[in-house]
Amino acid sequence: MMHFQLAGSGVMSAFYPHESELSRRVKQLIRAAKKQLEALCAMK
């Protein structure tokens, strides 16, 4: 079952490379936003 999931994700990234790139950027943005929020909370 795990092998099928891994192969499926590999096929998805092969067909939609820009999609994985986009999701990675979104995750980076979310991480940056969380850091900024934490910094603001620490400043108070």
UniProtKB/Swiss-Prot annotation:
Keywords, alphabetical: Activator, Transcription, Transcription regulation
> Which PROSITE patterns does the UniProt entry name for this protein?
LAMBDA_PHAGE_CIII
Q: Which cysteines are joined by disulfide bonds?
A: none
Q: Does the keyword Protein transport apply?
A: no
Pfam families the record matches: cIII (PF08134)
Q: What InterPro entries does the database record attribute to this sequence?
A: CIII_regul, Phage_lambda_CIII
- What does the protein in this record do? Presence of the CIII protein in the cell results in the stabilization of the CII transcriptional activator (a very unstable protein), CII activates CI, the gene for repressor, and thus promotes the establishment of lysogeny.
Q: What family does this belong to?
A: Belongs to the lambda phage CIII protein family.
Protein name, as recorded: Regulatory protein CIII
Q: Which organism is it from?
A: Escherichia phage HK022
Lineage of source species? Viruses, Duplodnaviria, Heunggongvirae, Uroviricota, Caudoviricetes
Q: Encoded by which gene? A: CIII
